[in-house]
Amino acid sequence: MNIIDELEWRGAIYQQTDEEGLRKWVEEKQISLYCGIDPSGDSMHIGHLIPFMILRRFQNAGHRPIILVGGATGTIGDPSGKKEERKLQSMEQISKNVESLRVQLGKIFDFEGDSAASMVNNYDWTKDVSILDFLRDYGKEFNVNTMLSKDIVASRLEVGISFTEFAYQILQAMDFNHLYEFNDCRLQIGGSDQWGNITAGLDLIRKKQGENAKAFGLTIPLLTKADGTKFGKSEGGAIWLNPEKTTPYEFYQFWINTDDRDVVKYLKYFTFLTEAEIDELAKQVEEEPHLRAAQKTLAAEMTKFVHSEEALEQALKISKALFSGDVTALTADEIEQGFKDVPTFVAEDAEVNLVDWLVTLGIEPSKRQAREDVTNGAIYINGERQQNVEKVIDASDRIENKFTIVRRGKKKYFLVSYK
Protein backbone atom coordinates (compact mmCIF):
# COMPACT_ATOMS: atom_id res chain seq x y z
CA MET A 1 0.00 0.00 0.00
CA ASN A 2 1.30 3.45 -0.92
CA ILE A 3 2.01 5.43 2.25
CA ILE A 4 -0.43 8.12 1.05
CA ASP A 5 -3.18 5.49 0.73
CA GLU A 6 -2.41 4.28 4.25
CA LEU A 7 -2.59 7.80 5.67
CA GLU A 8 -5.92 8.39 3.92
CA TRP A 9 -7.31 5.14 5.34
CA ARG A 10 -6.19 6.25 8.79
CA GLY A 11 -7.94 9.59 8.32
CA ALA A 12 -4.63 11.39 8.78
CA ILE A 13 -4.60 13.77 5.81
CA TYR A 14 -6.33 17.15 5.88
CA GLN A 15 -4.63 18.98 3.01
CA GLN A 16 -1.76 18.22 0.66
CA THR A 17 -0.11 19.99 -2.24
CA ASP A 18 0.13 18.14 -5.56
CA GLU A 19 -1.22 14.79 -4.36
CA GLU A 20 -0.46 13.06 -7.66
CA GLY A 21 3.12 14.32 -7.66
CA LEU A 22 3.69 13.30 -4.04
CA ARG A 23 2.24 9.82 -4.62
CA LYS A 24 4.57 9.27 -7.54
CA TRP A 25 7.56 10.68 -5.67
CA VAL A 26 7.16 8.41 -2.62
CA GLU A 27 6.59 5.35 -4.83
CA GLU A 28 9.67 5.90 -6.95
CA LYS A 29 12.14 7.38 -4.47
CA GLN A 30 13.25 7.32 -0.87
CA ILE A 31 12.50 10.86 0.27
CA SER A 32 13.55 12.97 3.21
CA LEU A 33 10.74 14.76 5.02
CA TYR A 34 10.47 16.84 8.15
CA CYS A 35 8.26 18.02 10.95
CA GLY A 36 9.20 20.68 13.47
CA ILE A 37 8.40 21.57 17.04
CA ASP A 38 9.28 24.74 18.92
CA PRO A 39 10.69 24.35 22.46
CA SER A 40 8.02 26.47 24.14
CA GLY A 41 7.98 23.98 27.02
CA ASP A 42 10.14 21.21 28.45
CA SER A 43 7.81 18.42 27.35
CA MET A 44 5.65 17.40 24.45
CA HIS A 45 2.06 16.44 25.14
CA ILE A 46 0.10 13.86 23.17
CA GLY A 47 -1.35 16.54 20.88
CA HIS A 48 2.22 17.29 19.70
CA LEU A 49 2.69 13.60 19.02
CA ILE A 50 0.19 13.44 16.13
CA PRO A 51 2.35 14.83 13.26
CA PHE A 52 5.39 12.93 14.53
CA MET A 53 3.40 9.69 14.33
CA ILE A 54 2.91 10.46 10.62
CA LEU A 55 6.63 11.13 10.29
CA ARG A 56 7.31 7.75 11.90
CA ARG A 57 4.93 6.02 9.47
CA PHE A 58 6.96 7.43 6.60
CA GLN A 59 10.08 6.03 8.25
CA ASN A 60 8.44 2.60 8.54
CA ALA A 61 7.70 2.87 4.80
CA GLY A 62 11.41 3.36 4.09
CA HIS A 63 11.74 7.15 4.01
CA ARG A 64 14.11 9.36 6.03
CA PRO A 65 12.55 11.57 8.72
CA ILE A 66 14.13 14.81 9.86
CA ILE A 67 13.04 16.04 13.29
CA LEU A 68 13.47 19.78 13.63
CA VAL A 69 13.63 21.32 17.09
CA GLY A 70 13.16 25.06 16.75
CA GLY A 71 15.89 26.60 18.84
CA ALA A 72 15.57 29.73 16.69
CA THR A 73 11.83 29.89 15.95
CA GLY A 74 11.18 29.05 19.59
CA THR A 75 12.68 32.39 20.60
CA ILE A 76 9.86 34.13 18.70
CA GLY A 77 6.80 31.92 18.97
CA ASP A 78 4.45 30.67 16.30
CA PRO A 79 1.25 32.77 16.16
CA SER A 80 -0.70 29.83 14.66
CA GLY A 81 -3.77 29.05 16.74
CA LYS A 82 -2.97 31.78 19.27
CA LYS A 83 -5.31 34.66 20.06
CA GLU A 84 -2.66 36.81 21.69
CA GLU A 85 1.07 37.42 21.68
CA ARG A 86 3.25 34.73 23.21
CA LYS A 87 5.51 35.60 26.13
CA LEU A 88 9.14 35.38 25.09
CA GLN A 89 11.37 32.98 27.00
CA SER A 90 15.04 33.37 27.87
CA MET A 91 17.65 31.73 25.66
CA GLU A 92 18.74 29.67 28.66
CA GLN A 93 15.24 28.26 29.15
CA ILE A 94 14.86 27.55 25.45
CA SER A 95 18.16 25.65 25.42
CA LYS A 96 16.98 23.50 28.34
CA ASN A 97 13.69 22.84 26.59
CA VAL A 98 15.51 21.85 23.39
CA GLU A 99 17.48 19.19 25.23
CA SER A 100 14.36 17.83 26.94
CA LEU A 101 12.54 17.55 23.62
CA ARG A 102 15.55 15.86 22.03
CA VAL A 103 15.33 13.10 24.63
CA GLN A 104 11.59 12.57 24.12
CA LEU A 105 11.76 12.61 20.33
CA GLY A 106 14.77 10.33 20.39
CA LYS A 107 12.59 7.53 21.76
CA ILE A 108 10.11 7.73 18.89
CA PHE A 109 12.40 7.22 15.88
CA ASP A 110 15.14 4.87 14.70
CA PHE A 111 18.46 6.61 14.14
CA GLU A 112 20.23 3.72 12.39
CA GLY A 113 19.77 1.88 9.10
CA ASP A 114 18.84 2.91 5.55
CA SER A 115 15.96 5.10 6.72
CA ALA A 116 17.77 6.54 9.74
CA ALA A 117 16.19 9.61 11.29
CA SER A 118 18.17 12.78 11.93
CA MET A 119 17.54 15.58 14.39
CA VAL A 120 18.36 19.21 13.61
CA ASN A 121 18.10 22.59 15.34
CA ASN A 122 17.23 25.61 13.20
CA TYR A 123 19.29 27.83 15.49
CA ASP A 124 22.37 26.32 13.81
CA TRP A 125 21.63 27.93 10.42
CA THR A 126 19.89 31.13 11.55
CA LYS A 127 22.17 32.35 14.34
CA ASP A 128 24.64 33.95 11.91
CA VAL A 129 22.06 35.53 9.58
CA SER A 130 22.32 39.30 10.03
CA ILE A 131 19.28 41.57 9.85
CA LEU A 132 20.52 42.88 6.49
CA ASP A 133 20.97 39.35 5.15
CA PHE A 134 17.49 38.46 6.40
CA LEU A 135 15.87 41.44 4.65
CA ARG A 136 17.86 41.17 1.40
CA ASP A 137 17.98 37.38 0.96
CA TYR A 138 14.59 36.42 2.36
CA GLY A 139 12.38 39.42 3.14
CA LYS A 140 12.51 40.50 -0.50
CA GLU A 141 10.94 37.17 -1.54
CA PHE A 142 7.77 37.71 0.52
CA ASN A 143 4.79 39.78 -0.56
CA VAL A 144 3.17 41.49 2.44
CA ASN A 145 -0.31 41.24 0.91
CA THR A 146 0.11 37.47 0.61
CA MET A 147 1.40 37.22 4.17
CA LEU A 148 -1.55 39.24 5.48
CA SER A 149 -4.04 36.97 3.71
CA LYS A 150 -2.85 33.81 5.47
CA ASP A 151 -5.18 32.61 8.22
CA ILE A 152 -2.45 32.62 10.86
CA VAL A 153 -2.03 36.38 10.40
CA ALA A 154 -5.53 37.42 9.27
CA SER A 155 -7.09 35.97 12.43
CA ARG A 156 -4.90 38.25 14.55
CA LEU A 157 -5.24 41.54 12.68
CA GLU A 158 -8.12 42.86 14.76
CA VAL A 159 -6.38 42.32 18.10
CA GLY A 160 -2.95 43.08 16.70
CA ILE A 161 0.18 41.11 15.90
CA SER A 162 3.79 42.14 16.41
CA PHE A 163 6.29 42.20 13.54
CA THR A 164 8.12 39.45 15.41
CA GLU A 165 5.24 36.99 15.14
CA PHE A 166 4.25 38.34 11.71
CA ALA A 167 7.71 37.36 10.45
CA TYR A 168 7.52 33.86 11.93
CA GLN A 169 6.34 32.37 8.63
CA ILE A 170 9.49 33.69 6.95
CA LEU A 171 11.69 31.87 9.46
CA GLN A 172 9.76 28.62 9.01
CA ALA A 173 10.02 29.03 5.24
CA MET A 174 13.78 29.50 5.64
CA ASP A 175 13.88 26.16 7.48
CA PHE A 176 12.17 24.29 4.65
CA ASN A 177 14.40 25.96 2.06
CA HIS A 178 17.54 25.12 4.06
CA LEU A 179 16.53 21.48 4.52
CA TYR A 180 15.64 21.22 0.83
CA GLU A 181 19.02 22.59 -0.21
CA PHE A 182 21.27 20.80 2.27
CA ASN A 183 19.29 17.69 3.28
CA ASP A 184 17.36 17.02 0.07
CA CYS A 185 14.15 17.37 2.11
CA ARG A 186 11.07 17.25 -0.13
CA LEU A 187 8.09 17.19 2.23
CA GLN A 188 6.99 19.12 5.31
CA ILE A 189 4.33 17.72 7.64
CA GLY A 190 2.35 19.75 10.16
CA GLY A 191 -0.96 20.27 11.89
CA SER A 192 -3.88 21.84 10.04
CA ASP A 193 -2.93 25.26 11.45
CA GLN A 194 0.47 25.04 9.71
CA TRP A 195 -0.83 25.21 6.13
CA GLY A 196 0.06 28.89 5.73
CA ASN A 197 3.59 28.38 7.05
CA ILE A 198 4.13 25.30 4.88
CA THR A 199 2.94 26.97 1.67
CA ALA A 200 5.17 29.96 2.47
CA GLY A 201 8.09 27.52 2.52
CA LEU A 202 7.08 25.99 -0.81
CA ASP A 203 6.90 29.47 -2.38
CA LEU A 204 10.37 30.32 -1.07
CA ILE A 205 11.82 27.05 -2.37
CA ARG A 206 10.48 27.77 -5.88
CA LYS A 207 11.98 31.27 -5.80
CA LYS A 208 15.33 30.17 -4.41
CA GLN A 209 15.77 26.75 -6.03
CA GLY A 210 13.92 27.30 -9.32
CA GLU A 211 10.40 26.75 -10.62
CA ASN A 212 11.11 23.06 -11.26
CA ALA A 213 12.01 22.36 -7.63
CA LYS A 214 9.91 19.46 -6.33
CA ALA A 215 8.66 19.97 -2.79
CA PHE A 216 5.40 19.13 -1.07
CA GLY A 217 3.32 19.92 1.99
CA LEU A 218 0.90 17.77 3.97
CA THR A 219 -1.24 18.70 6.96
CA ILE A 220 -3.15 16.60 9.46
CA PRO A 221 -6.74 17.21 10.57
CA LEU A 222 -7.48 18.66 13.99
CA LEU A 223 -8.26 15.71 16.24
CA THR A 224 -11.41 16.16 18.29
CA LYS A 225 -13.24 13.92 20.73
CA ALA A 226 -16.77 12.62 20.19
CA ASP A 227 -18.06 14.80 23.03
CA GLY A 228 -16.69 17.91 21.35
CA THR A 229 -13.89 18.57 23.86
CA LYS A 230 -10.26 19.05 22.94
CA PHE A 231 -8.19 15.92 22.44
CA GLY A 232 -5.16 15.40 24.65
CA LYS A 233 -6.48 16.70 27.95
CA SER A 234 -7.86 14.98 31.01
CA GLU A 235 -9.52 16.48 34.07
CA GLY A 236 -6.03 16.98 35.46
CA GLY A 237 -4.78 18.88 32.41
CA ALA A 238 -2.53 17.95 29.49
CA ILE A 239 -1.19 14.42 29.06
CA TRP A 240 2.58 14.84 28.82
CA LEU A 241 5.21 12.54 27.33
CA ASN A 242 7.62 13.41 30.14
CA PRO A 243 7.13 10.68 32.80
CA GLU A 244 7.87 13.19 35.55
CA LYS A 245 4.84 15.25 34.47
CA THR A 246 2.49 12.41 33.52
CA THR A 247 3.48 9.05 34.98
CA PRO A 248 3.35 5.98 32.70
CA TYR A 249 0.42 4.74 34.81
CA GLU A 250 -1.51 8.00 34.28
CA PHE A 251 -0.58 7.85 30.60
CA TYR A 252 -1.93 4.29 30.35
CA GLN A 253 -5.12 5.24 32.19
CA PHE A 254 -5.77 8.14 29.81
CA TRP A 255 -5.96 5.77 26.86
CA ILE A 256 -7.90 3.11 28.81
CA ASN A 257 -10.61 5.71 29.47
CA THR A 258 -11.11 6.45 25.76
CA ASP A 259 -14.75 6.72 24.73
CA ASP A 260 -16.06 3.83 22.57
CA ARG A 261 -16.93 6.43 19.93
CA ASP A 262 -13.29 7.54 19.67
CA VAL A 263 -11.25 4.40 20.19
CA VAL A 264 -11.19 3.09 16.60
CA LYS A 265 -10.18 6.54 15.31
CA TYR A 266 -7.35 6.65 17.86
CA LEU A 267 -6.20 3.14 16.95
CA LYS A 268 -5.86 4.31 13.35
CA TYR A 269 -4.12 7.55 14.30
CA PHE A 270 -1.74 6.40 16.99
CA THR A 271 -0.92 2.71 16.58
CA PHE A 272 0.89 0.70 13.93
CA LEU A 273 -1.71 -2.06 13.95
CA THR A 274 -2.83 -3.31 10.54
CA GLU A 275 -6.20 -2.61 8.96
CA ALA A 276 -7.29 -6.20 9.67
CA GLU A 277 -6.28 -5.93 13.35
CA ILE A 278 -8.12 -2.64 13.80
CA ASP A 279 -11.20 -3.97 11.99
CA GLU A 280 -11.30 -6.89 14.44
CA LEU A 281 -11.06 -4.54 17.41
CA ALA A 282 -13.79 -2.33 15.91
CA LYS A 283 -15.99 -5.42 15.71
CA GLN A 284 -15.36 -6.12 19.40
CA VAL A 285 -16.32 -2.55 20.29
CA GLU A 286 -19.66 -3.13 18.56
CA GLU A 287 -20.33 -6.62 19.94
CA GLU A 288 -18.63 -6.67 23.36
CA PRO A 289 -17.95 -3.07 24.43
CA HIS A 290 -17.87 -4.04 28.13
CA LEU A 291 -14.63 -5.99 27.59
CA ARG A 292 -12.88 -2.78 26.40
CA ALA A 293 -10.49 -4.82 24.27
CA ALA A 294 -9.85 -1.90 21.91
CA GLN A 295 -9.06 0.48 24.78
CA LYS A 296 -6.71 -2.04 26.41
CA THR A 297 -4.89 -2.55 23.13
CA LEU A 298 -4.65 1.19 22.49
CA ALA A 299 -3.33 1.86 26.01
CA ALA A 300 -0.77 -0.93 25.76
CA GLU A 301 0.49 0.09 22.32
CA MET A 302 0.85 3.75 23.25
CA THR A 303 2.52 3.15 26.62
CA LYS A 304 5.07 0.83 25.01
CA PHE A 305 5.72 3.25 22.16
CA VAL A 306 6.17 6.42 24.23
CA HIS A 307 7.70 4.89 27.35
CA SER A 308 8.78 1.22 27.26
CA GLU A 309 7.67 -2.37 27.70
CA GLU A 310 8.78 -2.14 31.33
CA ALA A 311 6.64 0.98 31.87
CA LEU A 312 3.64 -0.85 30.43
CA GLU A 313 4.21 -3.80 32.77
CA GLN A 314 4.36 -1.37 35.70
CA ALA A 315 1.12 0.32 34.62
CA LEU A 316 -0.63 -3.06 34.31
CA LYS A 317 0.69 -4.13 37.69
CA ILE A 318 -0.57 -0.93 39.35
CA SER A 319 -3.97 -1.24 37.65
CA LYS A 320 -4.33 -4.84 38.82
CA ALA A 321 -3.32 -3.95 42.39
CA LEU A 322 -5.80 -1.08 42.59
CA PHE A 323 -8.59 -3.23 41.17
CA SER A 324 -7.96 -6.16 43.52
CA GLY A 325 -6.93 -4.11 46.56
CA ASP A 326 -3.76 -6.21 46.95
CA VAL A 327 -1.07 -3.53 46.98
CA THR A 328 1.66 -5.40 48.85
CA ALA A 329 3.53 -6.36 45.67
CA LEU A 330 3.93 -2.75 44.54
CA THR A 331 7.31 -1.04 44.72
CA ALA A 332 7.72 2.46 46.13
CA ASP A 333 8.03 3.85 42.59
CA GLU A 334 4.82 2.10 41.52
CA ILE A 335 3.03 3.42 44.60
CA GLU A 336 4.09 6.97 43.76
CA GLN A 337 2.68 6.51 40.24
CA GLY A 338 -0.57 4.81 41.19
CA PHE A 339 -1.39 6.97 44.21
CA LYS A 340 -0.18 10.31 42.88
CA ASP A 341 -3.61 11.93 43.13
CA VAL A 342 -4.95 10.41 46.37
CA PRO A 343 -4.93 12.36 49.67
CA THR A 344 -1.42 12.13 51.10
CA PHE A 345 -0.30 12.48 54.71
CA VAL A 346 3.05 12.58 56.46
CA ALA A 347 3.35 10.62 59.72
CA GLU A 348 5.89 10.61 62.53
CA ASP A 349 8.38 7.76 62.53
CA ALA A 350 6.97 6.14 65.67
CA GLU A 351 4.81 3.27 66.91
CA VAL A 352 1.22 4.50 67.31
CA ASN A 353 -2.14 2.95 68.05
CA LEU A 354 -4.12 2.50 64.81
CA VAL A 355 -7.17 4.48 66.00
CA ASP A 356 -5.05 7.39 67.26
CA TRP A 357 -2.96 7.28 64.07
CA LEU A 358 -6.01 7.54 61.79
CA VAL A 359 -7.39 10.51 63.73
CA THR A 360 -4.04 12.32 64.06
CA LEU A 361 -3.45 12.11 60.31
CA GLY A 362 -6.96 13.30 59.50
CA ILE A 363 -8.09 10.12 57.77
CA GLU A 364 -10.84 9.74 60.39
CA PRO A 365 -12.72 12.71 61.93
CA SER A 366 -12.90 11.27 65.46
CA LYS A 367 -11.82 8.34 67.60
CA ARG A 368 -15.42 7.15 67.80
CA GLN A 369 -15.69 7.02 64.00
CA ALA A 370 -12.26 5.41 63.72
CA ARG A 371 -13.14 2.64 66.22
CA GLU A 372 -16.44 2.05 64.43
CA ASP A 373 -14.79 1.76 61.00
CA VAL A 374 -12.06 -0.56 62.31
CA THR A 375 -14.55 -2.77 64.17
CA ASN A 376 -16.76 -3.00 61.07
CA GLY A 377 -13.82 -4.00 58.87
CA ALA A 378 -13.86 -0.83 56.78
CA ILE A 379 -10.16 -0.02 57.30
CA TYR A 380 -7.42 -1.72 55.28
CA ILE A 381 -3.68 -1.27 55.79
CA ASN A 382 -1.68 -2.20 52.67
CA GLY A 383 -4.66 -4.20 51.43
CA GLU A 384 -5.17 -6.14 54.67
CA ARG A 385 -8.40 -5.65 56.62
CA GLN A 386 -7.93 -4.38 60.18
CA GLN A 387 -10.54 -5.12 62.87
CA ASN A 388 -8.41 -4.84 66.00
CA VAL A 389 -8.74 -1.40 67.62
CA GLU A 390 -5.66 -2.20 69.72
CA LYS A 391 -3.39 -2.66 66.68
CA VAL A 392 -0.17 -0.66 66.71
CA ILE A 393 1.15 0.86 63.48
CA ASP A 394 4.91 0.25 63.25
CA ALA A 395 7.71 -0.23 60.70
CA SER A 396 6.29 -3.58 59.59
CA ASP A 397 3.33 -1.70 58.10
CA ARG A 398 5.49 0.18 55.62
CA ILE A 399 6.20 -0.78 52.03
CA GLU A 400 9.93 -0.45 51.33
CA ASN A 401 10.02 1.50 54.62
CA LYS A 402 8.52 4.48 52.76
CA PHE A 403 4.76 4.20 52.45
CA THR A 404 1.63 2.85 54.10
CA ILE A 405 -1.49 2.59 51.97
CA VAL A 406 -4.77 3.04 53.82
CA ARG A 407 -8.11 2.14 52.31
CA ARG A 408 -11.43 3.08 53.86
CA GLY A 409 -14.36 1.18 52.43
CA LYS A 410 -14.15 -0.13 48.89
CA LYS A 411 -12.44 2.69 47.01
CA LYS A 412 -11.28 5.54 49.26
CA TYR A 413 -7.48 5.46 49.36
CA PHE A 414 -4.97 7.45 51.40
CA LEU A 415 -1.19 7.43 51.13
CA VAL A 416 1.00 7.89 54.18
CA SER A 417 4.71 8.68 53.99
CA TYR A 418 7.11 9.18 56.89
CA LYS A 419 9.33 11.96 58.20
Swiss-Prot record:
SMART domains, sorted: S4
List of residues binding ATP: K233
UniProt key word RNA-binding: yes
Keywords (A to Z) from UniProt: Aminoacyl-tRNA synthetase, ATP-binding, Cytoplasm, Ligase, Nucleotide-binding, Protein biosynthesis, RNA-binding
Annotated InterPro entries: aa-tRNA-synth_I_CS, aa-tRNA-synth_Ic, Rossmann-like_a/b/a_fold, S4_RNA-bd, S4_RNA-bd_sf, SYY-like_C, Tyr-tRNA-ligase, Tyr-tRNA-ligase_bac-type
Matches recorded under Pfam families: SYY_C-terminal (PF22421), tRNA-synt_1b (PF00579)
Enzyme class: ligase
EC number(s) recorded for this UniProt protein: 6.1.1.1
Compartment annotation: Cytoplasm
Binding site for L-tyrosine: Y34, Y168, Q172
Any one GO molecular function term: ATP binding
Short sequence motif 'HIGH' region: positions: 39-48
Database matches in NCBIfam families: tyrS
Protein family according to the UniProt entry: Belongs to the class-I aminoacyl-tRNA synthetase family. TyrS type 1 subfamily.
Subunit structure: Homodimer.
Protein name according to UniProt: Tyrosine--tRNA ligase
Organism expressing this protein natively: Listeria innocua serovar 6a (strain ATCC BAA-680 / CLIP 11262)
Taxonomic lineage: Bacteria, Bacillati, Bacillota, Bacilli, Bacillales
